[in-house]
C-alpha cells in the first residue's frame, strides 16, 4: 500500500512538473538542461543503469520525466533549420526516450542500455541542424 501510494505521488509530481513547464512555455535550452546537463535526467539514468542492482523505481520516474521533456521538445520551435527536419529529429528523440521508458518499466537492463545508447547518438545531428 505504501509503495503504491509512493509511486502514485511520484507519477503525479512528474506529470505535474511536465504540464507546468509546458504551460510556462519552456524553451529548448531549459529542456536540454533539465534532460542532459550534468545532474540532469539522462546522466542520472545512465548512472543508475550502471549500478549492480538498478533502482528501477527511480529510473522509472526519471524516464517518465524524460519522455515528458522530449514531448515538449517536439512542440518547440528550433532556433535554426527547417520545421520538417526538426519534426523528424525531435520525434526520433521522443521515440528513443519512449523505448528507454518501456525497457525500464519492464526492468529490462539490456533493452534500457540499448535505448540509452541510441538516445546518446541522437545529439550531434540535431545540434548541427538546429542549434545556434
Question: What is the meaning of each model-derived region?
Answer:
Residues 107, 129-132:
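Inter-heme linker and motif-flanking segments adjacent to c-type heme-binding CXXCH motifs
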Residues 119-130:
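The canonical Cys-X-X-Cys-His
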Amino acid at each position: 500500500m505504501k509503495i503504491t501510494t509512493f509511486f502514485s505521488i511520484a507519477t503525479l509530481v512528474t506529470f505535474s512538473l511536465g504540464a507546468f513547464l509546458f504551460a510556462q512555455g519552456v524553451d529548448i535550452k531549459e529542456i536540454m538542461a533539465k534532460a542532459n546537463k550534468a545532474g540532469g535526467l539522462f546522466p542520472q539514468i545512465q548512472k543508475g543503469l550502471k549500478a549492480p542492482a538498478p533502482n528501477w523505481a527511480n529510473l522509472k520516474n526519471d524516464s517518465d520525466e524524460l519522455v515528458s521533456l522530449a514531448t515538449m521538445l517536439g512542440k518547440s520551435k528550433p532556433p535554426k533549420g527547417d520545421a520538417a527536419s526538426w519534426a523528424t529529429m525531435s520525434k526520433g528523440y521522443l521515440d528513443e526516450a519512449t523505448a528507454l521508458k518501456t525497457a525500464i518499466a519492464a526492468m529490462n537492463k539490456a533493452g534500457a542500455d540499448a535505448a540509452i545508447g541510441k538516445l546518446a547518438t541522437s545529439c550531434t545531428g540535431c545540434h548541427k541542424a538546429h542549434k545556434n
